[in-house]
């Protein structure tokens, strides 16, 4: 993969910037959109990468959704306790992988998909809205009354209104239902106690309110949590982001504030992602906001911002919002020498031949 290398002078400038950064967390996304296809299972394959991940100074690894899902990638889950039906591997392999990470002092982050859920059976209307928990005590055996009342055609009108954005491909779960709250919190605690996960990445977190997210974070007490709140930036007539993205980053700040700013909750800094995509194309002036600070969430609340260059949605084979491929190392030079918790993407680290360059930047950041 073609890549534009940093000049020595730019690297030295960035080295100077990094001097003010204290050692801290570095997140690693340990999969891409195609990882489920790997022969022999992704969990087993990733086991062979643990030493390299740990040696790079990475502190947390974000793993793919672990539950049974009608979509191979895991983002359409149904039987939440069933970890043996995952395309990435089985429950025993997952526990072995997490054990290997823990053995190197690296924490494991689960991809939590709770905005929506796929049903096993149809009700009397012929609608798939009867959920199977595969537990001996009927936990997660839900019906249409556990679906948001405004989520047609799945709902039967007895649930509470949705507290966030609609997800059209599957029933939106009613997170104001007390039984739903209780049983999902129990499942999260099971993922911690029995499987070994340390924290959560909340998928499609804009699908339910920050108050709802707070319930699950408070009841499961993860050491780290990060939310995906992906909304559109403000764009000008030239099709590029406006210089002022205060409204966009304020939404991220508000979410963390409502969940509890003193707790473990963070959000992916999509504001910085969008601005950086354009800035590296010869418009570095965009990296200074209207207030003279960094223009993303890291300019306002860096301790709660997780920066990234690409992920399984924006990059990989989906290419929903890809970073310029020939300037990826410029992106890493920025996020690894600026405040916030940087997230390194598997593809860039292992598949694009950028491991050594990223390693060096992480070493600069952590003082290793």
Swiss-Prot record:
Binding site residues for Ca(2+) 3: 151, 166-167, 170, 172
Pfam families: Alpha-amylase
Bilayer-spanning residue ranges: none
UniProt binding sites for Ca(2+) 1: 115, 162, 165, 172, 207
This enzyme's EC code(s): 3.2.1.1
Signal peptide positions on this chain: 1-24
Domain of life per record: Eukaryota
Cofactor: record remark: Binds 3 Ca(2+) ions per subunit.
Residues annotated to bind substrate: 75-76, 201-206, 230, 232, 250, 257, 293, 299-301, 312, 318
GO MF terms held by the record: alpha-amylase activity; metal ion binding
The protein's enzyme class: hydrolase
Site (Transition state stabilizer) location in chain: 313
Keyword tags: Calcium, Carbohydrate metabolism, Germination, Glycosidase, Hydrolase, Metal-binding, Signal
Cofactors that this protein relies on: Ca(2+)
Family as reported in the entry's similarity comment: Belongs to the glycosyl hydrolase 13 family.
UniProt miscellaneous comment: There are at least 4 types of alpha-amylase in barley. Type B isozyme mRNA is undetectable in unstimulated cells and increases a hundred-fold after stimulation with gibberellic acid.
Name of this chain's protein: Alpha-amylase type B isozyme
Biological classification of the source: Eukaryota, Viridiplantae, Streptophyta, Embryophyta, Tracheophyta
